[in-house]
């Protein structure tokens, strides 16, 4: 496996971990601060959207950088951003992240696109 393939595999494994709610496994793929940050948002977000899923659309790697494009979906079943549960779903919401790999694990993650406007509209929440 090439270094680029290994980096792409890290991002795909990250998505598996998020989808399976295996937050303790984040340390396999991410360095300390990134793993802690992911736990900090995944837990509460999963409380609001228990069936939240990420689908990998594409993963591109070059050098230490990896770009992941994902489609996300979930049903609003818990309070989120002060909004009570609506029971409505968001589907196919685009998210694009740039990751940096260091010593075989994700060392940084930058959200380039998180289409929260589409997510809010599908949930019936005024932006």
Question: Which residue stretches match the model-derived regions?
Answer:
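C-terminal and inter-domain tail/linker signature
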Residues: 1-127
């Amino acid at each position: 496996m090439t270094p680029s393939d290994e980096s792409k595999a890290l991002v795909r494994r990250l998505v598996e971990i998020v989808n399976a709610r295996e937050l303790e496994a984040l340390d396999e793929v991410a360095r300390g601060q990134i793993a802690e940050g992911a736990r900090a948002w995944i837990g509460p977000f999963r409380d609001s959207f228990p069936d939240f899923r990420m689908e990998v659309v594409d993963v591109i790697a070059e050098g230490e950088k990896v770009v992941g494009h994902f489609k996300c979906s979930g049903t609003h079943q818990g309070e989120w951003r002060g909004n009570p549960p609506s029971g409505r779903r968001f589907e196919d919401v685009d998210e694009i992240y740039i990751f940096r790999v260091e010593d075989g694990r994700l060392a940084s993650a930058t959200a380039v696109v998180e289409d929260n406007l589409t997510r809010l509209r599908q949930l019936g929440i005024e932006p």
